[in-house]
């Protein structure tokens, strides 16, 4: 099969809402549709030319979410003939959706596809496993689905404990973690103040008692955070532990979408490519150390693409926890100045199924802002996985 070049021709993301914040009453399907519709409009591609739509999602919040990609596609203007499907690779879902869309193009299933992700953690449901057939005498239990997916399925430990494990194994100190967290907050605040995200963000219409308002600014950022303030926070998951609410990612809401097109179609339709997908890779690691997943995934993508770490001008390595973010930087020899230059999961937030598409959007935008050539997008994945992709500015 002939190798097909795949280009990014349009991106869009919503601003990221904090847990129980501005987006708490916005349906997940609306977030997804908003991002997909904007990405199509920005790409210059006609909606009826989209050959496939793939959306990442982890936490279903409504029965419609089972149809998330299909709802987003049709409500964004794609014809009913456009196929769509959801993917769930947990924290890597948004990036996996982009990879899956690219695979559809690479295999000749279509020439243009959309990959993205959408998550409303604020609307995560509680469910009762005993309700369908009747509970026995005594109390029944409601399971917090949102909190549940943040636990390892084997050890039954919170992902925060896996971060503690990584810190212990790789010699990461509390001071290093808090310093990274503060740097993330400062970078995100500076990016917002400078308006760097304005071209990325599509406003979300939010219905309030006073009418419809537009949500267009990331709201999770804590610009006034300091190392001194973080150092006083108590461990969140383990007595005498290092992981706190201040050096961990947020629980958030948001969506993003990326339009991909095959090189021949880019030329034929006169589209303006933003970046080329150079390669991608996945890896598995010990579930109890899931945060180190980006290390083998990145090493795989370096081997496949023939690139070196020093070739990357921008590195979007999602901050699930400062512990794992520090360990990944240490193990791969990243230049900290190139890593998450505009903030990441700790400061901006981590709407799990959407984050991969959000940081892809950020990485490509930063390449164009700075004139860099290559960007790495990578993230750890609950259950013990890693995913990585490389994009080249064009």
Q: Where are the language model's segments positioned?
A:
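N-terminal extracellular/periplasmic Venus flytrap/periplasmic-binding protein-like
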Residues: 7, 12-14, 24-29, 33, ...
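Active-site pocket-shaping loop/turn-to-helix segments
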Residues: 13-41, 59-62, 85-99, 122, ...
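Phosphate/pyrophosphate-binding loops at sites that engage ATP/ADP/AMP, CoA/4′-phosphopantetheine
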Residues: 38-51, 166-171, 266-270, 299-313, ...
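Conserved catalytic cysteine-centered active-site region
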Residues: 57-112, 153-158, 224-250, 331-358, ...
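Active-site-proximal alpha-helical scaffold in enzymes
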Residues: 89-119, 167-196, 257-264, 329, ...
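Flexible glycine-/small-residue-enriched beta->alpha junction loops
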Residues: 112-169
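Active-site pocket-lining segment
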Residues: 161-164, 197-200, 207-208, 278-347
């Amino acid at each position: 099969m002939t190798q097909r070049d795949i280009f990014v021709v349009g991106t869009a993301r919503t601003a990221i809402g904090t847990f129980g914040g501005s987006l708490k009453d916005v349906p997940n399907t609306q977030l997804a549709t908003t991002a997909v519709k904007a990405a199509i409009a920005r790409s210059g591609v006609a909606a009826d030319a989209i050959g496939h739509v793939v959306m990442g999602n982890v936490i279903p919040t409504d029965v419609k979410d089972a149809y998330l990609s299909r709802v987003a596609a049709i409500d964004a203007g794609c014809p009913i003939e456009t196929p769509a499907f959801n993917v769930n690779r947990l924290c890597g879902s948004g990036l996996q959706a982009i990879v899956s869309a690219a695979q559809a193009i690479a295999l000749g299933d279509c020439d243009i596809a959309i990959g993205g992700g959408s998550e409303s953690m604020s609307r995560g449901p509680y469910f009762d496993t005993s309700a369908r057939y009747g509970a026995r005498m005594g109390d029944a239990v409601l399971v917090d689905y949102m909190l549940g997916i943040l636990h390892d399925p084997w050890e039954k430990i919170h992902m925060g404990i896996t971060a503690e494990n990584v810190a212990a194994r790789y010699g990461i100190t509390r001071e290093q973690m808090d310093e990274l967290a503060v740097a993330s907050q400062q970078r995100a605040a500076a990016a917002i103040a400078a308006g760097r995200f304005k071209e990325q963000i599509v406003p979300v219409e939010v219905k309030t008692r006073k009418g419809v308002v537009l949500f267009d600014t990331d709201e999770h950022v804590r610009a006034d955070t300091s190392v001194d303030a973080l150092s006083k926070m108590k461990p969140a998951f383990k007595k005498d532990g290092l992981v706190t609410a201040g050096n961990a990612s947020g629980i958030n809401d948001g969506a993003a979408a990326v339009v991909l097109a095959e090189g021949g179609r880019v030329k034929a339709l006169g589209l303006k490519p933003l970046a080329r997908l150079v390669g991608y890779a996945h890896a598995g690691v010990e579930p109890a150390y899931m945060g180190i997943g980006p290390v083998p995934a990145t090493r795989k993508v370096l081997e496949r693409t023939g690139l070196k770490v020093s070739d990357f001008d921008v590195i979007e390595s999602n901050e699930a926890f400062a512990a794992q973010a520090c360990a990944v930087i240490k193990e791969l020899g990243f230049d900290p100045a190139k890593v998450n230059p505009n903030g990441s999961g700790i400061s901006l937030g981590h709407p799990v199924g959407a984050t991969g598409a959000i940081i892809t959007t950020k990485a490509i935008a930063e390449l164009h802002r700075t004139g860099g050539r290559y960007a790495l997008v990578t993230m750890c994945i609950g259950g013990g996985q890693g995913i990585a992709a490389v994009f080249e500015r064009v």
